[in-house]
A protein has these predicted regions:
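Intrinsically disordered, low-complexity acidic/polar segments
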Residues: 62, 116, 149, 187-188
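A short beta-turn/loop motif at secondary-structure boundaries
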Residues: 41-43, 96, 145, 167-171
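Conserved acetyl-CoA-binding loop-helix of GNAT-fold acetyltransferases
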Residues: 115-128, 147, 151-155
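Residue-level recognition of the GNAT/N-acetyltransferase active site
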Residues: 110, 114, 143-145, 170
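Acetyl-CoA-dependent GNAT
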Residues: 2-6, 10-112, 123-125, 129-133, ...
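Conserved catalytic-core motifs of GNAT/GCN5-like acyltransferases
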Residues: 139-141, 154, 159-176, 189, ...
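Short coil/turn segments at alpha/beta junctions that flank glycine-rich nucleotide-binding fingerprints
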Residues: 116, 133-136
Length: 211
């Protein structure tokens, strides 16, 4: 995937088909609860936020240059239809806000793009957005068997706070409940800044949240 960069941005309506496809692939058995219609409803809900990571080929790979647009244009038309066919969504994350808590709905990455730091960057973007919305803590559920994800969450300050028995309808697996301490605390913010800097140093091809 040489010559390729990945950019994190807010999800738009035009991303829904690709995100639903990733959801189905990443969460078989659960994806029916987040259909394309459900994503449309989520994007209409002011308490829910989604971001996506998309793959962008450079001019050498694509053979053409993207038309540059001034910053004011991008702000004004932040939900414009994205006609740039080079934007191939490779991952997404979403959360909902409720009384000072940002609860992560899902973080999913296409099979061919895992272990590239994209999922971690989506988690970073999620925490960034939660801080912007003045959340106090971030929470989530994760499969009891998904140790890789649990280790990533622990790296970012999540701790095990409980267990939901037979939470996943597809196979009856338990869910581990994880939560951060206050993301507004100086201790968390210092650690988070360092983790973000380390990730940016290792993965220069992944550009943080824009727009």
């Amino acid at each position: 995937m040489s010559g390729t960069s990945y950019i994190i941005r807010r999800m738009t309506y035009d991303d829904i088909p690709q995100v639903a496809q990733i959801d189905k692939e990443a969460f078989p058995g659960e994806w029916v609860f987040r259909s394309q219609a459900a994503y449309k409803q989520d994007l209409d809900n002011p308490s829910i936020r989604y971001v996506v990571a998309y793959r962008e080929q450079d001019a050498r790979e694509s053979g053409r240059q993207a038309t540059p647009r001034p910053r004011w244009f991008k702000r004004l038309f932040s939900y414009e239809r994205r006609l740039n066919t080079r934007e191939y969504v490779v991952g997404f994350s979403g959360f909902w806000m409720m009384v000072g808590e940002a609860h992560i709905i899902a973080i999913g990455v296409r099979e061919g793009y895992r272990q590239l730091g994209i999922g971690e960057r989506l988690l970073i973007a999620t925490i960034d957005l939660a801080q912007t919305l003045r959340a106090n803590v971030v929470t989530l559920e994760v499969r009891a068997s998904n140790m890789i994800a649990q280790e990533l969450y622990k790296k970012y300050g999540f701790q095990v706070t409980g267990r939901r028995l037979k939470y996943y309808s597809s196979d009856g697996e338990d869910a581990i409940i994880m939560s951060t301490d206050s993301i507004a605390s100086l201790v968390f913010q210092a650690s988070f800044r360092q983790l973000k800097a380390d990730h940016a140093q290792r993965h220069r091809e992944i550009i943080g949240l824009v727009g």
